[in-house]
Amino acid sequence: PTLWELSSPMFSLPMTEYAQGLFETVLEEYEDLELNPSGRDEFMTKRQNFPFTDPERSVATYEELKATKKEFPELRNLPAVGGFDFASTRDFIAVGALFKVDGDYVFKSHSFVRKEFVDRIYSYSKPNENVNGKRRFAPIRQWEDEGLLTVLDEPSMDAQHVVDWFVRMRDEEGYEFQTICGDGYKMREYLQPKFEEAGFEVSWNGKFEEPLGYRVEVIRNFRAIDAQLSTVIEDSFANQKINFGDNDMMRWYTNNVLRHLKKDGNVEYIKKEDVRRKTDGFKAFEAAMFKADLLNEVDTTDFYDNLGWFMG
């Protein structure tokens, strides 16, 4: 802090009343970096006039991704926020349910992929693990066998698959959806009619009349939420507070995301490569994180302690 006057001359002594107030604000942000290291790039760009020299990196490190492989807790009857990515009907669609349990963001996801696309790009229908001497870029058939995705032999994937998944999670798995969030792109012509036919209310302003479990909230400017959510998402990865369960496809999705720091200091999430490196699952996760504040955190330790007292 004693050197900040080099980048901000107003911090030279004696400081004006305005400069003193700003200095205290910047000092608080600087001290917060110890707990929230993901904010370093933005701090250096916005507060020190020193653009970060490497503006692009993965959203999570290899070790942070490994740490997302945890056993799922019991999720039935817990509050959840749904998220989906429906940007393209001709390659991948992703859906998911977000929970908060014992401080962890727990995300259960599923994907729908179009057969023609995965045949052409990932050699899905070829029997061998290696194609032309090279290991498959994405093991689609393995993930299908593990129940992580559904391969659809359709010319264009029907939005009904998205709606049916959320209905099934609500009615059969007992997830208590506070809301379901997704991008407004293709909403009016594809998704909204399907959701409404199933009894959901689709809101473009965050206001609802339907009860919980029947609400879909449209994120009108999905690109803008990257900067809004980047700190909580990246700090959750860094502190090993994200649980993707036994789902290597979610780790693959996340590993394909490039964190790009724009010149204005804001973060945006982009693909590392447009065709093969899909990010749909991460975008569904991000959509759910948009309303993570609706989740009442569940402490299973207290639950089992109370259960033991009751049974004793």
PLM feature spans:
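Metal-dependent DNA phosphodiester-chemistry modules and their immediately adjacent helices/loops
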Residues: 1, 198, 203-299
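An acidic- and aromatic-residue-enriched active-site/binding cleft used to recognize and process polar
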Residues: 85-89, 100, 112, 182-187, ...
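Short, surface-exposed connector motifs at secondary-structure boundaries
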Residues: 170-179, 212-215
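Flexible loop/turn segments at secondary-structure boundaries
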Residues: 54-57, 88-93, 103-105, 115-119, ...
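Short glycine-rich phosphate-binding loop at a beta-alpha junction
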Residues: 174-187, 191
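Non-catalytic, compositionally simple segments
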Residues: 1-81, 90-92, 110-113, 121-154, ...
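Acidic, low-complexity intrinsically disordered tails
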Residues: 303-312
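Acidic, metal-ligating active-site segments
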Residues: 90-105, 281, 287-288
